[in-house]
Regions:
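Transmembrane-helix bundle of Major Facilitator Superfamily
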Residues: 1-181, 186-187
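Membrane-interface "helix-start" segments
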Residues: 189-192
Length: 192
């Protein structure tokens, strides 16, 4: 991979990881507003949060295996697409059921983003660039848990649906970038 393409690829991967991890933490400040809007119990609210986490854990090995079979481009697009579809379900939800399904779909899609990004870095960058890039990837993931509640608090005055609506244009840009930048098939790691 030429350096120019690598400079464009890494922000694409980092942004995807940030978006997926952010939505785990961004929902915290919105939980009371969601609870009030739908009249759901605290137990139902925990289901809303846990659906994301559980489906993310399920999605991680399945979407990573899908990436191994189909290549990172399609798997990343599917992961981001599922995440966006779940976000859209949350935006249009008029009842708690669609909220649960939306969080589950969103979490499942998010499950593929990090492992695919890590695999692309491992398979496309030269060895001397892999460690720093993977370190930044991990930092971005961790940073999301600091940024998430802050962003949630900033967007909440506009309505809790904005926490999920903001994902849609970002996902569209990520999908367009993946089509252009991600390899269709996994490349063998370079030994140079």
């Amino acid at each position: 991979m030429d350096p120019k393409q690598s400079r464009a690829l890494l922000p694409l991967l980092f942004t995807g990881v940030l978006m997926g991890a952010l939505d785990l933490a961004i929902v915290g400040p919105a939980l009371p507003a969601i609870q009030a809007d739908f009249g759901i119990t605290t137990r139902q609210l925990s289901v809303l949060f846990n659906a994301y986490v559980l489906c993310q854990m399920i999605g991680t090995p399945l979407l990573a295996k899908f990436s191994d079979r189909t290549g990172p481009r399609l798997a990343y697009i599917v992961s981001i697409g599922l995440f966006a579809a779940g976000s859209l379900m949350l935006v249009i939800a008029r009842g708690p059921e669609l909220l649960y399904y939306g969080r589950a779909v969103q979490g499942f899609g998010a499950g593929g983003i990090f492992p695919i990004a890590a695999a692309v870095i491992g398979n496309t960058l030269p060895p001397q660039e892999r460690g720093p890039a993977l370190g930044i990837l991990g930092t971005v993931f961790g940073l999301a848990f600091f940024i998430g509640p802050v962003m949630g608090g900033l967007l909440l005055p506009y309505g809790w649906r904005w926490l999920f609506l903001v994902n849609l244009p970002i996902a569209a840009v990520l999908i367009a970038g993946a089509i252009r930048l991600l390899p269709a098939r996994s490349e063998a790691p370079s030994a140079s």
